[in-house]
Amino acid sequence: MCEKIQKILARHGYGSRRYIESLIKSHSVKINDEVVKVGQRISINVIQKVIINNNNYKPKLNINKSLKVLLYNKPEGEICTRKDQRNRRTIFEKLPKLSNARWINIGRLDLNSSGLLLFTTDGELAYRLTHPSFNIERIYKVRVFGQFTENILKQLNVRVKLLDGYANFKSIQFKYGEGKNKWFNVSLCEGRHRIVRRIWEKLGFQVNKLVRISYAHLTLPKTLFPGTWITLNKHDIDVLCKKVNLR
C-alpha cells in the first residue's frame, strides 16, 4: 500500500509531520537518492535509503513497534525548541536519550507557562494529537488578574474574535481567589499559539500564572516535580492512539 512520504517518515520517528513537510518543501529529503515532493506517495517496502538535510539514515521501519510516550512536567523558563540561539534552557535537555529515534513534543507551552507536556517517538501520533479535527481536550489552571463582574463572567463562555479567528473556552470553572487575583480551570480542544492567554487578554485580563494540568485522558501527577518525567504504560498509550484512530 502506498502512503504519503511525510506520513510514513513521521510515523517511524523522523520527526513530526509538519517538520518533515517543511523539510520536503525545502528539497531537503531524499528517498532512495531521489528528492521527494510534498504529497508524494510510496510503498514503505521499497524504502532502502533515507537522506534528510544531507544526513544518511538507515530506514527505521519497525520503530513504531516500540512506540514510546513521556509525560513531562515542564517548568517555567524552558523553551519549546531543540536549540535556542539565546542559549535558554529547552524542554529536551532533561529527557532520556534515545539510540534509534528522537523525541517529538506533542504541542507546546510558552516560556512562562508550565505543566503537562507529552513527548513521543511517533510523529504521526504527535500530529494527530495536536490537530483540532480530533478534538483533544486540554485543561489549564490559570491565575487571572483583573476586575471581575457578573457580565464579564458570562462573556467567558462566548466566542471572542482574535487576529487568527474566533476562539472560546470549552468550559470554565472558578476555583478560588479574592480581590483581583482569581484562579480558574479552563479547557479547550485546540492549541493555537498562546490561545488561553489571548482569550483572557481580549476580555481585558492578564494571566500571570498558567499550568496545563490535563491533556486527553492524562492528568499531571501531583507527585511529579517540575523538570521530571514518567514513561506512559501500554494502556495509556493505547488509549491515546485510539482517540486519534491509530489503533
Swiss-Prot record:
Keywords: Isomerase, RNA-binding, rRNA processing. Gene3D superfamilies: Alpha-L RNA-binding motif, Pseudouridine synthase I, catalytic domain, N-terminal subdomain, RNA-binding S4 domain. Residues 3-73 form the S4 RNA-binding domain. GO terms for molecular function: 23S rRNA pseudouridine(2605) synthase activity; RNA binding. It is an enzyme of class 5 (isomerase). Responsible for synthesis of pseudouridine from uracil-2605 in 23S ribosomal RNA. This is Ribosomal large subunit pseudouridine synthase B. It comes from Buchnera aphidicola subsp. Baizongia pistaciae (strain Bp). The gene is rluB.
